[in-house]
Amino acid sequence: SRPPAKLDFIDHVVGNQPDGEMESVAKWYETILQFHRFWSVDDKQVHTEYSALRSIVMSNWEENIKLPINEPAPGKKKSQIEEYVEYYGGAGVQHIALNTQDIIKSVQNLQSRGVEFLQVPDSYYDILRQQLKLSKVKVSEDLDILQKLKILIDYDENGYLLQIFTKNMQ
């Protein structure tokens, strides 16, 4: 028998919308499902030199269901949201985030079940090790194991988050 995936719950489900449709989708969640705006950002808050996005996170009143809704904002190049909408011919689910208490075991078990994850270059971990030396954040997991499994570390002064992405599924 296969080992359990060891996934605890769905953290969030991200939906990408064409430009100009985010507000009407958010309104639908408010009106039909009685969700509320948990959080929102505009293109001044989420942007790079080349692209930007707007986002509204909708949640039920218990706040155990979170649905970020994204739409592109003008930029020098196409955003990942514009590319998604064009590629798939419209709105849809960009990703589903799953929570686990033991990402290392979950990734190992999912790999044994045939799940394929995105590759991360070793240079990412070389740079990360140097940056972590200068940070107050102390990662308790073994960096060599995280590197072997291609688990990413996102951190700031308040702590860190471990994450990994599967290859695209259709």
Question: Over which residues does each language-model region extend?
Answer:
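Active-site and NAD+-binding cores of ADP-ribose-processing enzymes
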Residues: 42
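Glyoxalase I/VOC metalloenzyme domain signal
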Residues: 1-38, 47-170
